[in-house]
Amino acid sequence: MSDQIKFIVDSLNKEPFKKNYNLITFDSLGPMQLLQVLNDVLAEIDPKQDVDIREEMPEQTAKRMLNLLGILKYKPPGNATDMSTFRQGLVIGSKPVIYPVLHWLLQRSNELKKRAYLARFLIKLEVPSEFLQDETVADTNKQYEELMEAFKTLHKECEQLKTSGFSTAEIRRDISAMEEEKDQLMKRVERLKKRVETVQNHQRMLKIARQLRVEKEREEFLAQQKQEQKNQLFHAVQRLQRVQNQLKSMRHAAADAKPESLMKRLEEEIKFNSYMVTEKFPKELESKKKELHFLQKVVSEPAMGHSDLLELETKVNEVNTEINQLIEKKMMRNEPIEGKLSLYRQQASIISRKKEAKAEELQETKEKLASLEREVLVKTNQTREFDGTEVLKGDEFKRYVSKLRSKSTVFKKKHQIIAEFKAEFGLLQRTEELLKQRQETIQHQLRTIEEKKGISGYSYTQEELERVSALKSEVDEMKGRTLDDMSEMVKKLNSLVSEKKSALAPVIKELRQLRQKCQELTQECDEKKAQYDSCAAGLESNRSKLEQEVRGLREECLQEESKYHYTNCMIKNLEVELRRATDEMKAYVSSDQQEKRKAIREQYTKNITEQENLGKKLREKQKAVRESHGPNMKQAKMWRDLEQLMECKKQCFLKQQSPASIGQVIQEGGEDRLVL
């Protein structure tokens, strides 16, 4: 209990309370002062509890504190009967009740602050089921539950952000930088608006630019969707290939293997899996649980200093030495009996370690095989993306090689044919050049003949006329085809329009009927809604009146209950004071001297006489000190002068005894002397 009180006093003297208590002053606090201290601690956890209990009824104070302690999940010691005493002790400010509560609150104040904060938003309001029959109340209650769930998720995200390393200073700097950037952008936008307003049709151009931006955003969104679908397709292809490879390997194994080998392999797999499940995994799980238990234990304990760690290390070393001594003693006692058993144990431990090592090696090999298969799958997908082909394996590669050989022979033949064609092409090209040269000479001769005859340019004009007539015939043919196509297109469009009209006629007729029906239903709905609103308003007014009456009656009931409990507490306090007064009167009136000595009056009178005698002695002592003060000061001064005189004589004597003064004549105030 003393450690508990010491912890409470130390905590109350620190921030944010700064009470400046010690053990005696804290122990001498009255019930109301203790309750005020408890209320201050609760107000530090939940700011809504910051009230002066002198301005509050005791029952209301106890009810408020009990409600908050219930929210904070404080469990009073004892059973149901102790709960009533706990409530009563909380009302009257009993120390055995208040001290454990203060100790519990001050030990985990940060955790309780968080719990009190969450309780403001996560304690669900109980709505009676008859009120939930109303649709408005039900919708509001549903919205309230959804907001509560949203608060839970937001609080989790907030805690994750707090633990993720982001500091508020960095966020504030980012916000200030964003605000500056926002101001700059607003200024730029204003300048651009002023520049754009001078341009003609700027509204239309802004509208087009807005549409362009929307379309670009839509294009980016579609590109993102396309990329996501590509990724999904890629993953689906990977899964498909993985499953196909598994199926192929299983078919290959089933085709090549016999039932005996399959059974043997299955038995080996079953043995390995059973060993992993029954021996290896439970051991690892047990070790992880122990490690977790130790870590939780370390986290729950308070932080240790260097001295505590040194003390724990010394204890661990002592325990290890004791264990080693006990093991040596046991081995010395049981060495002749358990010699063979220790050998067998060593062999069994070696075998178990080898078994565990092989199991781990097999597990690592399986993981490595799986990673290699994933890598092969990635490489095959990359090759497929690059050139659209797949990596061949086994028999497929052999077939590919044989096919490649046959294609190489065909390639050689085709290459030979191409060489022949190239040679023939060279001959034809040379023939073409010769014919062009011959044509040029003939054209030159023709032009000279035309000049001689006086009809120069006749051949050129003839060629141009032929070329233009050919072009005109081609254009006329194209025009005719275009007109035919246009007429056919018009016919098709007319037929489509007539078909759509005939198809939409019953739909339009049905739509008219539905519109008429919709108007009737909306009119009926408006009438029903008006009736509902009037009825709901009447019921709401009645409900509000009833709620006010119930609220008033509850407040009266609470006031009467608080008065009743306060009266009971005052009666008990008066009974205690009356009992003490009667005991005092009995002791004072009693003829027995022992009883009289126990009386408080006698004790106080005795203390008063003792203090008076002590004061008288002290005054006499003070008088004696005052009388002897002057002579004592004079005597002290004389002693100091004597000490100075003796010190001066000592210095003179030391000078006389020094060797530097031998053979010198020393002349002082009295006589002349020769020191030999």
Curated annotation (Swiss-Prot):
Record's keyword terms, sorted: Acetylation, Cell projection, Cilium, Cilium biogenesis/degradation, Coiled coil, Cytoplasm, Cytoskeleton, Developmental protein, Differentiation, Phosphoprotein, Spermatogenesis
Sites bearing Phosphothreonine, chain numbering: 61
Bias (Basic and acidic residues) ranges: 613-629
A Pfam match: IFT81_CH
GO biological process: cilium assembly; intraciliary anterograde transport; intraciliary transport; intraciliary transport involved in cilium assembly; regulation of smoothened signaling pathway; sperm flagellum assembly; spermatogenesis
Tissues in which the protein is found: Highly expressed in the testis (at protein level). Co-localizes with RABL2/RABL2A in the midpiece of elongated spermatids within the testis (at protein level).
Oligomer status and interactors: Component of the IFT complex B, at least composed of IFT20, IFT22, IFT25, IFT27, IFT46, IFT52, TRAF3IP1/IFT54, IFT57, IFT74, IFT81, and IFT88. Interacts with IFT74; the interaction is direct: within the IFT complex B, IFT74 and IFT81 mediate the transport of tubulin within the cilium. Interacts with tubulin; the interaction is direct. Interacts with IFT57 and IFT70B. Interacts with RABL2/RABL2A; binding is equal in the presence of GTP or GDP. Interacts with IFT88. Interacts (via the IFT74/IFT81 heterodimer) with RABL2B. Interacts with CFAP61.
Protein's recorded name: Intraflagellar transport protein 81 homolog
Species assigned in the record: Mus musculus (Mouse)
Phylogenetic classification of the source organism: Eukaryota, Metazoa, Chordata, Craniata, Vertebrata
Gene name tied to this protein: Ift81
